[in-house]
Amino acid sequence: MLIPRRVKHRKQHHPGRSGAATGGTKVSFGEYGIQALSPAYVTNRQIESARIAMTRHIKRGGKVWINIYPDRPLTKKPAETRMGSGKGSPEWWVANVKPGRVLFELSGVNEEVAREALRLAIHKLPLKARIVRREGGE
Protein backbone atom coordinates (compact mmCIF):
# COMPACT_ATOMS: atom_id res chain seq x y z
CA MET A 1 0.00 0.00 0.00
CA LEU A 2 1.17 3.49 -0.76
CA ILE A 3 1.25 5.59 2.42
CA PRO A 4 3.52 8.55 3.24
CA ARG A 5 6.21 7.70 5.80
CA ARG A 6 6.08 11.05 7.56
CA VAL A 7 3.77 14.02 7.21
CA LYS A 8 4.14 17.50 8.62
CA HIS A 9 0.44 17.71 9.50
CA ARG A 10 -1.66 14.64 10.29
CA LYS A 11 -4.93 16.26 9.19
CA GLN A 12 -5.40 18.50 6.15
CA HIS A 13 -8.16 20.43 4.46
CA HIS A 14 -9.87 18.60 1.63
CA PRO A 15 -8.24 19.59 -1.66
CA GLY A 16 -10.42 21.11 -4.35
CA ARG A 17 -11.32 18.91 -7.30
CA SER A 18 -12.34 21.59 -9.80
CA GLY A 19 -10.27 22.51 -12.83
CA ALA A 20 -8.11 20.45 -15.14
CA ALA A 21 -4.68 18.99 -14.43
CA THR A 22 -1.80 21.31 -15.28
CA GLY A 23 1.01 18.74 -15.25
CA GLY A 24 1.35 15.04 -15.92
CA THR A 25 -1.08 15.07 -18.83
CA LYS A 26 1.08 13.21 -21.35
CA VAL A 27 2.45 9.68 -21.45
CA SER A 28 6.12 10.21 -20.63
CA PHE A 29 7.59 6.89 -19.43
CA GLY A 30 5.73 4.06 -21.16
CA GLU A 31 3.95 3.51 -24.47
CA TYR A 32 0.34 3.43 -23.23
CA GLY A 33 -1.40 5.12 -20.32
CA ILE A 34 -4.65 5.72 -18.45
CA GLN A 35 -5.84 9.34 -18.58
CA ALA A 36 -8.53 10.59 -16.18
CA LEU A 37 -11.58 12.25 -17.74
CA SER A 38 -13.32 13.18 -14.47
CA PRO A 39 -12.12 14.42 -11.07
CA ALA A 40 -11.90 12.00 -8.14
CA TYR A 41 -10.10 11.04 -4.96
CA VAL A 42 -8.25 7.79 -5.66
CA THR A 43 -7.37 5.85 -2.50
CA ASN A 44 -4.22 3.84 -1.92
CA ARG A 45 -6.26 0.61 -2.06
CA GLN A 46 -7.71 1.50 -5.46
CA ILE A 47 -4.24 2.29 -6.83
CA GLU A 48 -2.93 -1.05 -5.56
CA SER A 49 -5.93 -2.94 -6.93
CA ALA A 50 -5.48 -1.40 -10.39
CA ARG A 51 -1.74 -2.18 -10.32
CA ILE A 52 -2.38 -5.83 -9.44
CA ALA A 53 -5.01 -6.15 -12.20
CA MET A 54 -2.53 -4.83 -14.77
CA THR A 55 0.48 -6.86 -13.67
CA ARG A 56 -1.53 -10.10 -13.52
CA HIS A 57 -2.74 -9.61 -17.07
CA ILE A 58 0.65 -8.77 -18.57
CA LYS A 59 2.19 -11.67 -16.62
CA ARG A 60 6.00 -11.35 -16.68
CA GLY A 61 6.42 -9.00 -19.63
CA GLY A 62 6.24 -5.24 -19.61
CA LYS A 63 6.77 -2.50 -17.07
CA VAL A 64 4.18 -0.47 -15.14
CA TRP A 65 4.59 3.09 -13.87
CA ILE A 66 2.29 4.63 -11.24
CA ASN A 67 2.17 8.40 -11.73
CA ILE A 68 -0.05 9.34 -8.77
CA TYR A 69 0.67 9.10 -5.06
CA PRO A 70 -1.87 9.19 -2.20
CA ASP A 71 -0.41 12.03 -0.15
CA ARG A 72 -3.60 13.54 1.34
CA PRO A 73 -5.33 12.14 4.42
CA LEU A 74 -9.13 11.93 4.54
CA THR A 75 -10.62 11.88 8.02
CA LYS A 76 -13.76 10.23 9.37
CA LYS A 77 -15.55 10.45 12.70
CA PRO A 78 -16.61 7.20 14.39
CA ALA A 79 -20.14 5.88 13.89
CA GLU A 80 -22.85 7.20 16.26
CA THR A 81 -20.71 10.12 17.40
CA ARG A 82 -22.27 13.50 18.06
CA MET A 83 -21.25 16.42 15.91
CA GLY A 84 -18.55 18.75 17.13
CA SER A 85 -15.62 17.89 19.39
CA GLY A 86 -13.01 18.23 16.68
CA LYS A 87 -12.11 16.65 13.42
CA GLY A 88 -12.13 12.87 13.02
CA SER A 89 -9.07 10.67 12.77
CA PRO A 90 -7.37 9.96 9.41
CA GLU A 91 -8.97 6.95 7.72
CA TRP A 92 -7.64 6.87 4.14
CA TRP A 93 -4.87 8.32 2.05
CA VAL A 94 -6.01 9.69 -1.29
CA ALA A 95 -4.54 11.17 -4.44
CA ASN A 96 -6.44 14.18 -5.74
CA VAL A 97 -6.86 13.40 -9.45
CA LYS A 98 -8.02 16.06 -11.90
CA PRO A 99 -9.21 15.57 -15.49
CA GLY A 100 -6.38 15.10 -17.96
CA ARG A 101 -3.96 13.48 -15.51
CA VAL A 102 -2.15 10.31 -16.64
CA LEU A 103 -2.47 7.82 -13.77
CA PHE A 104 -0.67 4.69 -14.97
CA GLU A 105 1.72 3.94 -17.81
CA LEU A 106 2.66 0.66 -19.41
CA SER A 107 5.28 -0.52 -21.92
CA GLY A 108 7.01 -3.67 -23.12
CA VAL A 109 3.91 -5.53 -24.33
CA ASN A 110 1.96 -5.52 -27.60
CA GLU A 111 -1.03 -3.25 -28.10
CA GLU A 112 -3.83 -5.80 -27.52
CA VAL A 113 -2.35 -6.97 -24.21
CA ALA A 114 -1.68 -3.38 -23.11
CA ARG A 115 -5.21 -2.21 -23.93
CA GLU A 116 -6.80 -5.15 -22.09
CA ALA A 117 -4.56 -4.67 -19.04
CA LEU A 118 -5.37 -0.95 -18.89
CA ARG A 119 -9.09 -1.66 -19.37
CA LEU A 120 -9.02 -4.01 -16.37
CA ALA A 121 -7.26 -1.32 -14.32
CA ILE A 122 -9.80 1.37 -15.31
CA HIS A 123 -12.60 -0.78 -13.86
CA LYS A 124 -10.88 -0.65 -10.47
CA LEU A 125 -10.81 3.17 -10.39
CA PRO A 126 -13.63 5.49 -9.22
CA LEU A 127 -13.47 7.80 -12.24
CA LYS A 128 -14.03 7.96 -15.97
CA ALA A 129 -10.84 7.36 -17.89
CA ARG A 130 -9.51 6.55 -21.33
CA ILE A 131 -6.53 4.71 -22.75
CA VAL A 132 -3.98 6.98 -24.42
CA ARG A 133 -0.92 6.25 -26.51
CA ARG A 134 2.43 8.01 -26.42
CA GLU A 135 2.79 10.87 -28.89
CA GLY A 136 6.01 11.70 -30.69
CA GLY A 137 8.54 10.23 -33.03
CA GLU A 138 9.91 7.21 -31.22
Swiss-Prot record:
**Family annotation (Pfam families):** Ribosomal_L16 (PF00252)
Q: Could you state one GO biological process linked to this protein?
A: translation
- UniProt keyword terms in alphabetical order: Ribonucleoprotein, Ribosomal protein, RNA-binding, rRNA-binding, tRNA-binding
User: Could you tell me where the Basic residues compositional bias lies?
Assistant: 1-16
Known PANTHER family for this protein?
50S/60S RIBOSOMAL PROTEIN L16, LARGE RIBOSOMAL SUBUNIT PROTEIN UL16M
Q: How does it assemble?
A: Part of the 50S ribosomal subunit.
Q: Indicate what this protein is called per its UniProt record.
A: Large ribosomal subunit protein uL16
Q: Which organism is it from?
A: Paenarthrobacter aurescens (strain TC1)
